Design a protein with these regions (language model features):
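Extracytoplasmic small-molecule ligand-binding "clamshell" domains
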Residues: 30-104, 113
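Periplasmic-binding protein-like
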Residues: 45, 123-127, 210-251, 274-290
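Alpha-to-beta junction loops
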Residues: 41, 76-78, 95-103, 148-151, ...
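A ligand-binding cleft/hinge motif common to bilobed small-molecule-binding domains
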Residues: 88, 104-113, 163-166, 193-231
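Acidic, polar ligand-binding/catalytic clefts
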Residues: 68, 79-144, 220-226
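Ligand-binding clefts/hinges and TM-proximal coupling segments of bilobed small-molecule sensing domains
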Residues: 80, 159-174, 248-290
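Bilobed "Venus flytrap"/periplasmic-binding protein-like clamshell domains
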Residues: 41, 46-49, 59-72, 127-179, ...
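Extended ligand-binding regions for polar small-molecule ligands
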Residues: 61-74, 134-135, 150-151, 158, ...
Length: 290
């Protein structure tokens, strides 16, 4: 899943009409009942590290493992994972083409008008990739600006370019690459000092850079919002809006999975860190009403 892909308001509102007009079996009988008797379908978008086709042809990913760990204690042992385009996930759930969204999806107030959400599973922000040992001690955009000579790599047209500018990094110290792998190569060749991308991309780059002297800069200070608090996006599962019993049961199992430590263990298998866990008291309702 690429959570930052926008879904147009017209598409969202159009889906809302579908939601009101189309009621699948799952919406009538409830997903708990349907899941236990028939199994469920969870739409995915074939994107790493969330839910994707592995080298053996099986669908794997952090979201797939977490989903099964939530559903199995509820007596739901069969889950089919149809692949669709990312932009078709919300309309597909609204139209009843599948029972829930198994790919991680940013909680977005516009989408909240159309679908329900689980409570957040992970959070996403920016991240730095640096040379091993982080020789320049770069843990924030402010650190790069204060250094004055550190060269930061990112992609043209991305939010990261504006964030670098807003943080006081001079244009001459921002080096743009069309592909994240090109930015990684520049870091490895000492042509830049730090690579700045959303954390999911940094996690992917780390896997590609395995065996080379680069690392993720931790801790990392996120850019502040208007209230001076760190800016985060929150991933969750998309659930049917008109099935509160299922949403409650899903969230209860998610909370148990987190409290046991098993949620973090699954995430760590895919390159996540504890930094990607949202605060336990952040809820979908809060994010929908912000």
């Amino acid at each position: 899943m690429k959570g930052l892909k926008p879904l147009s308001l017209s598409a969202v509102l159009g889906s809302a009409l579908l939601l009101n007009a189309v009621f699948s079996f799952s919406a009538v009988a409830g997903l708990l009942e349907k899941g236990r008797s028939q199994g469920l379908t969870a739409g995915i978008a074939n994107e790493q590290p969330y839910a994707y086709v592995g080298t053996d042809g099986k669908i794997v990913g952090a979201n797939v493992e977490i989903l099964r760990a939530i559903l199995e204690p509820l007596g739901i042992n069969k889950v089919e994972l149809p692949i669709t385009e990312f932009g078709s996930l919300v309309p597909g759930l609204a139209a009843g083409r599948f029972d829930l969204i198994g790919a991680g999806l940013f909680i977005n107030p516009a989408r909240c008008k159309v679908i329900g959400y689980s409570n957040p599973v992970t959070r996403s922000g920016g991240a730095f990739l640096v040379k091993a040992g982080n020789p320049l001690k770069l843990h924030s955009l402010k650190d790069v600006a204060a250094n004055g000579k550190a060269r930061l790599a990112t992609q043209p047209g991305s939010n990261q370019v504006q964030e670098a500018k807003d943080s006081g990094i001079s244009n001459g110290n921002v080096v743009l690459f069309d592909k994240d792998t090109e930015a990684l190569a520049a870091l490895q060749a000492d042509r830049v000092d730090v690579v700045y991308f959303p954390d999911a991309e940094i996690i992917g780059l780390l896997k590609k850079a395995e065996g080379t002297p680069v690392e993720r800069a931790l801790p990392f200070e996120q850019i502040p919002d208007a209230d001076g608090k760190p800016t985060w996006n929150y991933h969750a599962y998309g659930l049917p809006k008109n099935d509160p019993a299922f949403i409650q049961a899903f969230n209860e199992q998610l909370a148990k999975l987190r409290a046991s430590g098993d949620l973090l263990k699954i995430l760590q298998k895919y390159g996540y860190t504890e930094n990607e866990l949202p605060p336990a008291d952040v809820t979908a309702e809060q994010r929908c009403n912000r």
